[in-house]
Amino acid sequence: LTLIENSSANGSDNLSVPLVFGVLFPFLFGPLSRIEVASRFLEVLPFVTLFGLLSFRSKSLSSSGTITAISLGVLLYSLGGWIFVVPILAFFISGSVLSRLLQTNEQVLEKTGARDPLQVIANGGAPLLALLLGVFSSNMDWAIMGFLGSVASATSDTWSTEWGMRFGGAPRHILNLSRLEKGLSGGVTLPGFMGALGGSVFIASIGLFFMSFGNWFWAIIVIGVFGSVTDSLLGLLQAKYQLPESNDQAPSLTEKKEWNGVQLKKVKGLKW
């Protein structure tokens, strides 16, 4: 709970701490014995702490994002085991590696820098929810499916963005195929789609280390790609802001509310 409190911002710990305790209470005093949970906690804490510190050192995670990621990793392993940790670690590591290998020098305004707590939760919240539902319902097979599907969606979306930005050229509107500026949500490219497919196959393949091959493998791939496409569709609704200066070499719109310390004017879309 201390880790959760430290990773909460703007007083949100007043809500997050009791919510997290409420979620953990049934496990600490219910189906999973306290000894079992404590044993798993001690097993995984050094590993995820090392991973978090290395990620912080490489600037993949902010300080608060590191605490959140460590908390997430400990919780996933304590309640589910390695099958609920390895895929999401693969997602974070592959995303960071691709971001560095495929970075471009183009003037594209996108959200960069170390992942903060909200980004960690955005990517890890759905997998955690799948695990919690599985433990509550005592149906871990469906929990594993939901977990791998949600991680595949996040990986698919991340790989799609990285491959699309590096190799895709001008993206197309996902619905009417009109040209869009690079870096704005809602655009698709063929390399980006191939990246999405690759990300899904990557996570589904990791699942093979824990489960025998079956129809679930193809289902995870489809779910992952579908999640990436859905994200692009929702991206069309995301707020876009007018940049104060633009030209043929620089975009005119961004999804950032602020640019060089100046609050930008929203021209379309919805604020999330």
Where in the sequence are the language-model features?
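Interhelical loop and helix-boundary elements at the membrane-water interface
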Residues: 1-28, 36-272
